[in-house]
């Protein structure tokens, strides 16, 4: 029974409503096991006509969280190609026996990224220590493989049911194997922000992720990654998303663009 903002208990001290953290807690909230969430989404494009392209993008994330620690796994993959006329030595389009232009598929994007994070909550569960290891490849950016490892201190700045914000500050080591350009490695500082807001009675989720690796020996070669999007639940665990991202690589290979900007519309499954 609730009377004047207090829970009245038989043969026990009364409790103010703000003293009740969790009603009907799940097992993980009592210290048993993990609370597992995640999603897998894809964006597929198939164009035929004046523009003939094929694009595939896959993105996956899963988070296992307990009262003691949190494990985050992320991966994404992008592949795209375009059909272009096959030409002879004089630059003229080749044709088949029926007079149709012969076209060949040429790749225009081929990149992937995997990342794993481990966070250990301290005595104040809003604070945590963490390790982050990641690998990526982008052949068209001349990156055969880039690996990085970071150690950081993090804090949950906001932990409301409808608004969360985590901030992390740490150190990193980055090693890049280029396809053509001379390989590079450096140590740096990391500043990361992760936020989510539930809008319109949790019918829409606004999410934001900012990951920065500051090259302490040459700041103009730093890496900045920003992602902002909206997720909309559909039915039976399906969801749609609209997402904008900007990746700035100050240490890009010579002749390659430092800034990649994308706008994606996704559909996927969440659990």
Task: Give residue ranges: language-model regions.
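Compositionally biased alpha-helical segments
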Residues: 1-47, 52-53, 57-61, 113
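Outer-membrane pore/translocation modules
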Residues: 16-23, 30, 76-192
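Membrane-embedded beta-strand positions of outer-membrane beta-barrel proteins
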Residues: 40-42, 73-75, 129-133, 151, ...
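Transmembrane beta-strands of outer-membrane beta-barrel pores
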Residues: 44-48, 77-81, 133-139, 155, ...
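Solvent-exposed loop/turn segments connecting transmembrane beta-strands
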Residues: 46-55, 65-67, 106-109, 137-145, ...
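Transmembrane beta-barrel domains of outer membrane proteins
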Residues: 61-65, 117-121, 134, 154-156, ...
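Repeated loop/turn-to-beta-strand initiation elements of outer-membrane beta-barrel proteins
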Residues: 67-73, 124-129, 160-165, 198-206, ...
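Outer-membrane beta-barrel "beta-signal"
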Residues: 259-271
């Amino acid at each position: 029974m609730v009377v004047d903002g207090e829970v009245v208990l038989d043969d026990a001290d009364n409790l103010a409503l703000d003293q009740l953290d969790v009603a009907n807690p799940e097992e993980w909230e009592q210290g048993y096991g993990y609370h597992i969430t995640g999603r897998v989404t894809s964006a597929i494009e198939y164009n035929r006509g004046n523009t003939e392209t094929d694009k595939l993008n896959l993105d996956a994330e899963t988070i296992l969280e307990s009262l003691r620690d949190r494990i985050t796994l992320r991966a994404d993959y992008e592949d795209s190609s375009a059909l272009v006329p096959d030409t002879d030595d004089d630059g003229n389009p080749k044709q088949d026996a029926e007079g149709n232009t012969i076209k060949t598929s040429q790749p225009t994007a081929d990149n992937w990224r995997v990342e794993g994070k481990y966070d250990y909550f301290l005595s104040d569960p809003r604070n945590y220590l963490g390790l982050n290891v990641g690998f990526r490849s982008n052949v068209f950016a001349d990156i055969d493989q880039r690996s990085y490892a970071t150690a950081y201190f993090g804090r949950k700045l906001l932990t409301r049911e409808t608004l969360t914000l985590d901030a992390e500050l740490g150190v990193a080591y980055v090693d890049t194997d280029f396809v053509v350009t001379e390989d590079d490695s450096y140590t740096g500082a990391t500043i990361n922000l992760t936020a989510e807001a539930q809008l319109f009675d949790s019918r829409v989720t606004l999410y934001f992720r900012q990951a920065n690796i500051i090259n302490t020996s040459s700041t103009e070669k730093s890496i900045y990654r920003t992602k902002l999007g909206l997720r909309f639940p559909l039915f039976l665990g399906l969801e749609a998303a609209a997402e904008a991202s900007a990746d700035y690589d100050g240490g890009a290979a010579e002749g390659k663009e430092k800034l990649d900007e994308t706008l994606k519309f996704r559909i996927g499954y969440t659990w």
